[in-house]
C-alpha cells in the first residue's frame, strides 16, 4: 500500500493528525492539485469562486469519499469552492482546508505562557468572516490528543469530516468552518493519548445545552459592557454595601408547575423586590453551566456559559443590564477551586490530567468528589483568570465572590496525614494556587478596576485583602467566617447562659481591622441540618423572632459590609430547599411575625444607606468605639459608630428577655439624643418598649465618660440613637 493510500485510510479512520498537509490546494510535482475529504459524496468539482464556473471534476480515488485532481492552466492559488453531489443533490461549499493558520504568533506565545489577557477571544468558537467567507473559527487546547475534530449539527456529528490543524507550538487545534452559524450545536471529538475516542464539550463555549444534554452552542462573544463611576463607587470600602444572596432557581417559582422563573421573569420580579428591600448588591449563586442541580452551581463545567436553565446567554445579559439600570450592583459566586469529573467535561481532557493535578493527593477533592485545577500549569491559570475578566468585561459583573479559597491555598485541606503532598519547601500551602489568586486579582485590578473580588476564606491566612505587592492575595473583601460562627453560637444559647459566653460578641473586634470584612449570613448557614436562622434562635415564638430582630440590628451596626441569604430577610422557618420556592406565603398575614422581620430588614437597609456613620469607616478603628463591653450579667452591649465628620450613632443591644429600665450609658457627646431604630418596635411586631422623644444627657460620669444617658432597653432588642442637631 502506498503512503498516499495509508494517509487516506488514516483520514477515514480518524487517525490522521495533520489534515492540512493532505487536504486543500497543494503544489505538487504534477501541478496545482486539490484534494477533498467528502464522505459518502458521489461527485465533486472545483469551482472558481470569482465567477461560479466549474473548472475540473475531481476523481473519486477512494469509494468512501476522497477526491483529488489537477487544476488545468493554473499555477497560483486562487479562491475556489467545491460543487459536491450527495444523492443527486449538488451543493456548492467552501473548503475549510483552503484557509491558512488562524492563531497569530503573539497569541500562540501568550497562550503558551499563560498570560493572554483575553484567551476567550482566541479559544472556543467564534463567528468570523475570513477571505469574504462567513463561518465559525474553532480552537481548543488538547496537546496530547492524536487527532481532534469539530463535530456538530452541521456535519452529522461525524468526526471524519472536519479534523483540525494542530499548532505544535502550544498544543492548540484550530479550524475555520465556512457557513457554520450561530445557534448550532457542536463538540470536539478527539482520539486521546491512549487511542480512545472522546467527545468533549468546549471549555470556552459561551453557551451550552441545558442538562441532561451536554453539547456546546455557537454563540457570538458578547460585546463589552461599559463601566460607570456610580457602579464603581458602590463597590468602594467607604460605601454602604448590603448584599442579597440569591439562588435563581429557588428564589421564586411558578406556582402551577414549580418550574423556574426565566431571566426575564426574574428581571421583572426580583429587581423590584431588591429595590423595595433596600439592598445595594445582588450576589448570584453560580450561574455557570453545571450538570447537577443539587450542586447549586458549585460544580460548574461551563465556566464561560450562563446556565440555560433560565434562558439564553443574551437573556442573562439583559437581566444584568436591568439590575444595573435599577442601580443594583451584581456579584457572582465564582468557583475556580474544583470541577466535576463528568466524561464530557475537563476531566482527562485529552487522555491526560490536563486541567487537573495528576496525583489524586493533589488533584482529587474527597469532600465533593471533584477534581482540583492544576494551578501550576500556565494554560489552566490563563483559562481561569481569563474567565474572571470575561464576566466583568462581557457581562458587566461588578464583582466575584471566590468560593472555598481555603481549599485552594492549603494542600492539607480536609486531608489526613499521608493524604497530601507538601510543597517544594515542605509546607502545606499550595504556592501555585496562591500565585494564581495573586495573578488574577492583580490582572483584574488593571483590566477591570471598577470591579471587586471577595474571598470566602475560612482560616486565618494573613493578608487576604492586602495587595499582591504587599504579599497579600489581593482581594478587596473577605467573608468574616469567624464573626458569623461566634455570633450565631452566641445567639443559639439560652439567654440565661449568654453571660458565660459574653466574649463571643466582643472577640471579633480584636481582629476586625486585620482584613476588609463582609459579615455573611449565607446559604451555608441554612442547610445540611443547621436549621434556619429563625429556628436556631432559643425560646418561644415571641423570643425567637425578637432574638433574630435584635441580632439583625446588631449586625447592621457592626463594622463590615453585610450579606444576607434570600429568605432570611423574612425569617423563613424551614431550611432552604433548592428544589422549591421560598415560603412567600409566610408574608400573607399583613401584621404577622414574618412581615415584621421583613419590615425591619428593609428599614435597616434604608437607614444604613443614608447614615455614613454605619459604613464610612468600616475598616478604620476611629469608626468604632465600645461604650459598654463588660456587662456580662445583663448581656448588654453598647458601642458608637462614627463617620469622618465625627457624627455618631449609639448602638445598644440587650440579649436577654428582661427589659432594662434606667440603664445608664456613658457618652462622648452631651446633649439631646433621639431613638431612630428599635427592633422591638410595634412596627416589627415587638413589645414596643423604648425611648420616646428626646433623651437629654446628664452630667453624671459613667463608663469612663463625664456625661451619660439613661435609657430603657427593651427585651431582646437593639436600639440606634443619634444626637439631635
Swiss-Prot record:
Pathway: Glycan biosynthesis; glycogen biosynthesis. It holds the Pfam family GlgB_N. GO terms for cellular component: cytosol. GO terms for biological process: glycogen biosynthetic process. SMART domains: Aamy. Its EC number is 2.4.1.18. It catalyses: Transfers a segment of a (1->4)-alpha-D-glucan chain to a primary hydroxy group in a similar glucan chain. The active site is at residues 403, 456. It comes from the Bacteria. GO terms for molecular function: 1,4-alpha-glucan branching enzyme activity; cation binding; hydrolase activity, hydrolyzing O-glycosyl compounds. Keywords: Carbohydrate metabolism, Glycogen biosynthesis, Glycogen metabolism, Glycosyltransferase, Transferase. InterPro entries: A-amylase/branching_C, Branching_enzy, GlgB, GlgB_N, GlgB_N_E_set_prok, Glyco_hydro_13_cat_dom, Glyco_hydro_13_N, Glyco_hydro_b. Catalyzes the formation of the alpha-1,6-glucosidic linkages in glycogen by scission of a 1,4-alpha-linked oligosaccharide from growing alpha-1,4-glucan chains and the subsequent attachment of the oligosaccharide to the alpha-1,6 position. HAMAP family: GlgB. This is 1,4-alpha-glucan branching enzyme GlgB. It comes from Pectobacterium atrosepticum (strain SCRI 1043 / ATCC BAA-672) (Erwinia carotovora subsp. atroseptica).
Amino acid at each position: 500500500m502506498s503512503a498516499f493510500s495509508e494517509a487516506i485510510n488514516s483520514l477515514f479512520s480518524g487517525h490522521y493528525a495533520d489534515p492540512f498537509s493532505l487536504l486543500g490546494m497543494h503544489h505538487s510535482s504534477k501541478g496545482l492539485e486539490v484534494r477533498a475529504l467528502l464522505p459518502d459524496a458521489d461527485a465533486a468539482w472545483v469551482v472558481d469562486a470569482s465567477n461560479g464556473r466549474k473548472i475540473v471534476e475531481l476523481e473519486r480515488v477512494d469509494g468512501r469519499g476522497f477526491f483529488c485532481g489537477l487544476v488545468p492552466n493554473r499555477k497560483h492559488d486562487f479562491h475556489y469552492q467545491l460543487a459536491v453531489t450527495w444523492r443527486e443533490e449538488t451543493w456548492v461549499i467552501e473548503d475549510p482546508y483552503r484557509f491558512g493558520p488562524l492563531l497569530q504568533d503573539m497569541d500562540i506565545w501568550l497562550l503558551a505562557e499563560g498570560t493572554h489577557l483575553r484567551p476567550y477571544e482566541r479559544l472556543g468558537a467564534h463567528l468570523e468572516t475570513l477571505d469574504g467567507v462567513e463561518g465559525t473559527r474553532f480552537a481548543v487546547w488538547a496537546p496530547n490528543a492524536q487527532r481532534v475534530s469539530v463535530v456538530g449539527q452541521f456535519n452529522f456529528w461525524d468526526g471524519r469530516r472536519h479534523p483540525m490543524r494542530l499548532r505544535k507550538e502550544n498544543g492548540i487545534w484550530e479550524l475555520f468552518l465556512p457557513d457554520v452559524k450561530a445557534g448550532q450545536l457542536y463538540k470536539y471529538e478527539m482520539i486521546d493519548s491512549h487511542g480512545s475516542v472522546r467527545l468533549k464539550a468546549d471549555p470556552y463555549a459561551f453557551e451550552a445545552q441545558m442538562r441532561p444534554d451536554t453539547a456546546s452552542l455557537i454563540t457570538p462573544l458578547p460585546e463589552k459592557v461599559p463601566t460607570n463611576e456610580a457602579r464603581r463607587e458602590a463597590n468602594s470600602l467607604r460605601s454602604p454595601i448590603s448584599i442579597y444572596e440569591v439562588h435563581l432557581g429557588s428564589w421564586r417559582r411558578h406556582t402551577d408547575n414549580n418550574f423556574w422563573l426565566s431571566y426575564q421573569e426574574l428581571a421583572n420580579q426580583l429587581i423590584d423586590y431588591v429595590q423595595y428591600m433596600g439592598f445595594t448588591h445582588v450576589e448570584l449563586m453560580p450561574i455557570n453551566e453545571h450538570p447537577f442541580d443539587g450542586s447549586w452551581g458549585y460544580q460548574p463545567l461551563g465556566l464561560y456559559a450562563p446556565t440555560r436553565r433560565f434562558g439564553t446567554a443574551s437573556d442573562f445579559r439583559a437581566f444584568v443590564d436591568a439590575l444595573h439600570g435599577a442601580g443594583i450592583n451584581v456579584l457572582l459566586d465564582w468557583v475556580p477551586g474544583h470541577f466535576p469529573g463528568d466524561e464530557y467535561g475537563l476531566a482527562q481532557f485529552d487522555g491526560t490530567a490536563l486541567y487537573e493535578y495528576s496525583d489524586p493527593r493533589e488533584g482529587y477533592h474527597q469532600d465533593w468528589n471533584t477534581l482540583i485545577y492544576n494551578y501550576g500549569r500556565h494554560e489552566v491559570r490563563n483559562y481561569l483568570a481569563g474567565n474572571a475578566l470575561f464576566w466583568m468585561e462581557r457581562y458587566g459583573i461588578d464583582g466575584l465572590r471566590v468560593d472555598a479559597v481555603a481549599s485552594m491555598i492549603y494542600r492539607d485541606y480536609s486531608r489526613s496525614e499521608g493524604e497530601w503532598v507538601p510543597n517544594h519547601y515542605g509546607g502545606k500551602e499550595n504556592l501555585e494556587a496562591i500565585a494564581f489568586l495573586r495573578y488574577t486579582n492583580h490582572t483584574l485590578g488593571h483590566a477591570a478596576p471598577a470591579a471587586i473580588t471577595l474571598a470566602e476564606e475560612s482560616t486565618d491566612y494573613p493578608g487576604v485583602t492586602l495587595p499582591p505587592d504587599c504579599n497579600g492575595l489581593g482581594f478587596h473583601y473577605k467573608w468574616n467566617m469567624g464573626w458569623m460562627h461566634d455570633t450565631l453560637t452566641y445567639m443559639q444559647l439560652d439567654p440565661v447562659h449568654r453571660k458565660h459566653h459574653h466574649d463571643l460578641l466582643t472577640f471579633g473586634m480584636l481582629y476586625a481591622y486585620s482584613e476588609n470584612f463582609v459579615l455573611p449570613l449565607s446559604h451555608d448557614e441554612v442547610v445540611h441540618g443547621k436549621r434556619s436562622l429563625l429556628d436556631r434562635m432559643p425560646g418561644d415564638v415571641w423570643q425567637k423572632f425578637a432574638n433574630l430582630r435584635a441580632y439583625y440590628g446588631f449586625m447592621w451596626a457592626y463594622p463590615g459590609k453585610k450579606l444576607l441569604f434570600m429568605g432570611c430577610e423574612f425569617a423563613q422557618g424551614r431550611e432552604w430547599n433548592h428544589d422549591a420556592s421560598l415560603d412567600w406565603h409566610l408574608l400573607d398575614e399583613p401584621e404577622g411575625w414574618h412581615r415584621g422581620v421583613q419590615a425591619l430588614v428593609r428599614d435597616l437597609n434604608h437607614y444604613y444607606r443614608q447614615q455614613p456613620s454605619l459604613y464610612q469607616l468600616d475598616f478604620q478603628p476611629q469608626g468604632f468605639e465600645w461604650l459598654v463591653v463588660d456587662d456580662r450579667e445583663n448581656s448588654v452591649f453598647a458601642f458608637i459608630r462614627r463617620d469622618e465628620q465625627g457624627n455618631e450613632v449609639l448602638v445598644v443591644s440587650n440579649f436577654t428577655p428582661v427589659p432594662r429600665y434606667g440603664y445608664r450609658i456613658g457618652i462622648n457627646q452631651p446633649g439631646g439624643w433621639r431613638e431612630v431604630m428599635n427592633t422591638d418596635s410595634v412596627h416589627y411586631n415587638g413589645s414596643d418598649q423604648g425611648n420616646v422623644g428626646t433623651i437629654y444627657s446628664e452630667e453624671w460620669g459613667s463608663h469612663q465618660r463625664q456625661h451619660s444617658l439613661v435609657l430603657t432597653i427593651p427585651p431582646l432588642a437593639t436600639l440606634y440613637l443619634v444626637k439631635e442637631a
